[in-house]
Amino acid sequence: MSSPTIPSRLYSLLFRRTSTFALTIAVGALFFERAFDQGADAIYEHINEGKLWKHIKHKYENKE
């Protein structure tokens, strides 16, 4: 008897039952959203370096 391959193992663990399939999709969407959002923010901040308020506010704050 041969050992199960990776795709068949994934199918049996994550996609065979509807409940685990839905949970897999929801968790995948959550992680994708977080990664995409952080990546987009990093790119935006890199492109606008020195133009955003958090980069220049030290010039305008009162030092007491």
From Swiss-Prot:
Gene3D superfamilies, per the entry: Cytochrome b-c1 complex subunit 9 (1.20.5.260)
SUPFAM superfamilies: Subunit X (non-heme 7 kDa protein) of cytochrome bc1 complex (Ubiquinol-cytochrome c reductase) (SSF81514)
Keyword Translocase: no
Primary localization: mitochondrion
Keywords noted in UniProt: Electron transport, Membrane, Mitochondrion, Mitochondrion inner membrane, Respiratory chain, Transmembrane, Transmembrane helix, Transport
Presence of keyword Electron transport: yes
Membrane-crossing residue ranges in chain numbering: 19-43
Any single GO CC term annotated in Swiss-Prot or TrEMBL for this entry: mitochondrial inner membrane
Membrane topology reported for the UniProt record: Single-pass membrane protein
Mitochondrial matrix compartment segments: 2-18
A biological process from GO: mitochondrial electron transport, ubiquinol to cytochrome c
Mitochondrial intermembrane side: 44-63
UniProt-annotated location(s): Mitochondrion inner membrane
Family of this protein: Belongs to the UQCR10/QCR9 family.
Job description of the protein: Component of the ubiquinol-cytochrome c oxidoreductase, a multisubunit transmembrane complex that is part of the mitochondrial electron transport chain which drives oxidative phosphorylation.
Subunit structure: Component of the ubiquinol-cytochrome c oxidoreductase (cytochrome b-c1 complex, complex III, CIII), a multisubunit enzyme composed of 11 subunits. The complex is composed of 3 respiratory subunits cytochrome b, cytochrome c1 and Rieske protein UQCRFS1, 2 core protein subunits UQCRC1/QCR1 and UQCRC2/QCR2, and 6 low-molecular weight protein subunits UQCRH/QCR6, UQCRB/QCR7, UQCRQ/QCR8, UQCR10/QCR9, UQCR11/QCR10 and subunit 9, the cleavage product of Rieske protein UQCRFS1.
Protein name: Cytochrome b-c1 complex subunit 9
Species of the source: Mus musculus
Lineage of producing organism: Eukaryota, Metazoa, Chordata, Craniata, Vertebrata
